UniProtKB/Swiss-Prot annotation:
Region (Disordered): 1-30
This protein's name: Bifunctional methionine biosynthesis protein MetXA/MetW
Family that this chain belongs to: In the N-terminal section; belongs to the AB hydrolase superfamily. MetX family.
Coarse class of the protein's main subcellular location: cytoplasm
Organism: Rhodopirellula baltica (strain DSM 10527 / NCIMB 13988 / SH1)
Cell location: Cytoplasm
Length: 623
């Protein structure tokens, strides 16, 4: 029988079948960034001082930003896009003649962030060097008008958000339709929700974390040391010097580039010509192809970025800390009113998926609307900027930003099988339901559609799925149902006690590694549990084994050879009943089917022999 819990695969072919990735597949949009003038940049200066989180203030600030699309009359279609450390306001092309943007695959007409109907705003961050106030600007308190340099105040992600809040007020935006960002941009959108819980309808945080882990902190410390010990750093006042700390900044960037890639990406990119590097004019080692590449990237970076800005922004990222425990993160997001979409990447070791799951676990415990996907990729942290991976996760963003009035969720076109119909009949209307191994979400959609109420689901009527196959995650999300990417073999730590009325395990029991642990978890999280499973004591299977002396096999539900079956376990109705008795649960209802014959089997007709499928609802008394 096919398991409801699918093996993790991408929406593309598996790595084994498609061969090694091409260098083009691994090309980040960072490669197209330059120091060219920002032709579509807009500027606004705020005369009032900006108090800073760690003390002091900036007497005035200038914000450089770009916009796409048209703001509607009530300002409800505005999307804030937040960039990473080395990004800028130029997130996307404005027309065919424009320079490439760093998120061209995501922002534009007809794209997931659709500028035909959304008004997109992307500001250069405070502390940056592409138009907004930063260390390279004149210090108004300096008697000779020198740049701030290293005297630029120590700012935080919170200060960056406050500057963006001034811009939002200036543009007349009271609430963002969404705040979207990756890496450091993800930190910004999370801080937006922390500081202003009702500031956005949707929060999209990509390849990010609630705080940096110690390894990531260590890389940033080394990068700042490389810059600040460069003999040309001059205490940060190098702007009027003939030479700048380009060596230190280049080394910092080289180090950063390594953290943005993965082992697989680096092997694919550099092993084919490991000992045949492309020679470039550089003082840096070029014995290997990776050395030539890093030298090129490091030197190129010095032409468009300021060393003091790198120090300032990397420190702001390192100081960012929404909490290192689930309880602290729950406190951080307790008042949030938005829905959340979190996306991580399997090979990202700078902001590993486990850190996104920390946020997801806190949001789930708070009963916030959240969808989470871990995208399988070999591109590392840079995946959020790579076209192939944008094509994978972009549809999730498109769904989250869908106009529910003009573009309702994908029509359900639901065709339930008999065990799903039986589950549907058991669950009372208005129940909150968690579906483990939810597949394409059709059972949850049927539960929702049966007694649909206008507006978003309430806590009482909460519907949520757990799934690992990315095509199923997308299909479930396209139905407008929250779903999180999670391996059931790890239990259900994201959920709190009695969080749902019903927890469903549909056609998945036979694929679970630790059956007893998962059943106990279902009874902890749900007040009631429902399981459906294939009965391996079914008459045809017995006959096949006894008559032919071969591993049991039958048409339809059991049509697998012994060597390719997805099943780990081979439960029978009698065995499952015995196990439930050992777990001291009360069986509420049982439904048995001979699906092959299209017949319902009554309890007194020996279902252990005559049924190929069982549905059992149960609960635990004296919890």
């Amino acid at each position: 029988m096919t398991s409801g819990r699918s093996t993790r695969v991408t929406m593309f072919e598996s790595q084994a079948s498609m061969g090694e990735p091409s260098n083009e597949d691994l090309s980040s949009t960072d490669d197209v960034r330059t120091d060219a003038p920002l032709a579509y940049a807009k500027y606004v200066t705020f005369d009032q001082s900006l108090p800073l989180e760690r003390g002091g203030e900036l007497p005035e600030i200038r914000c450089c930003y770009e916009t796409w699309g048209t703001l509607n009359d009530d300002g409800s279609n505005a999307v804030l896009v937040c960039h990473a450390v080395s990004g800028d306001s130029h997130a996307a092309r404005h027309d065919e003649d424009d320079q490439p943007g760093w998120w061209d695959g995501l922002i534009g007409p007809g794209l997931p962030i659709d500028t035909d109907r959304l008004f997109v705003v992307c500001p250069n961050v405070l502390g940056g060097c592409r138009g907004s106030t930063g260390p390279g600007d004149a210090d108004p308190t300096s008697p000779d008008g020198k740049p701030y340099g290293a005297n630029f105040p120590r700012i935080t992600i919170g200060d960056i958000v406050e500057a963006q809040k001034l811009l939002a007020d200036h543009l007349g935006i009271r609430q963002w339709r969404a705040v979207v960002g990756g890496s450091l941009g993800g930190h910004q959108v999370l801080q937006w929700i922390n500081r202003y819980p009702d500031a956005a309808k949707t929060c999209v945080a990509i390849a990010t974390s609630p705080r940096l882990n110690s390894q990531a902190l260590g890389f940033d410390v080394i990068a700042r040391n490389a810059i600040q010990t460069d003999p040309h750093y001059a205490g940060g006042q190098y702007y009027d010097k003939d030479q700048r700390p380009d060596t230190g900044l280049a080394i910092a960037r080289m180090l950063g580039h390594i953290t943005y890639l993965s082992v697989e990406a680096m092997e694919a990119k550099f092993d084919p010509d490991r000992h045949d590097p492309r020679q470039i004019a550089s003082q840096f080692e070029q014995r290997f192809s990776i050395g030539s590449y890093l030298a090129h990237q490091g030197q190129k970076f010095t032409t468009r970025f300021d060393a003091n800005s790198y120090v300032t922004l990397s420190m702001a990222m390192d100081l960012f800390d929404l909490g290192g425990t689930r309880l602290k993160l729950m406190e951080t997001f307790d008042e949030a009113t938005c829905d959340f979409l979190l996306i991580s990447f399997s090979s990202d070791w700078l902001f590993p998926p486990a850190q996104s799951r920390e946020i997801v676990n806190a949001l789930t415990a708070l009963d916030k609307r959240v969808t989470y996907a871990e995208i399988t990729t070999n591109a590392g942290h840079d995946a959020f900027l790579i076209a192939k991976d944008i094509a994978t996760y972009g549809p999730l963003i498109r769904e989250r930003l869908r106009d529910t009035e003009t573009h309702p969720a994908v029509p359900s076109d639901i065709t339930l099988n008999v065990d799903e119909e039986s589950i549907l009949e058991i669950i009372p209307a208005g129940s909150s339901v968690l579906d483990l191994g939810c597949g394409n979400g059709q059972l949850l959609a049927a539960i929702r559609d049966r007694h649909r109420t206008p507006g978003p689901p309430t806590t009482e009527h909460r519907l949520m799925g757990v799934e690992v196959a990315q095509e199923n995650l997308l299909a479930t999300a396209m139905r407008g149902i929250d779903v999180i990417d999670y391996d059931l073999n790890h239990g259900l730590p994201a959920f709190i006690d009695d969080q749902f009325d019903y927890v469903i395990l549909n056609a998945t029991l036979q694929a679970v590694e630790n059956v007893v642990e998962l059943l106990n978890e279902m009874l902890r999280v749900g007040r009631h549990a429902i399981i459906s499973f294939p009965n391996f004591a079914y008459r045809q299977l017995r006959d096949h084994y006894v008559t032919h002396g071969r591993s049991p096999k039958a048409p339809g539900e059991f049509d697998f050879d012994w060597h390719n079956t997805p099943n780990r376990r081979f439960p029978t109705i009698a065995d499952v009943r015995d196990l439930l008795g050992q777990l001291n649960v009360v069986i509420d209802e049982e439904v048995f089917w001979d699906v092959d014959q299209g017949q319902r089997i009554e309890p007194d007709n020996d279902p252990n022999l005559n049924a190929d499928t069982a549905v059992i609802a149960f609960h635990r008394e004296n919890r």
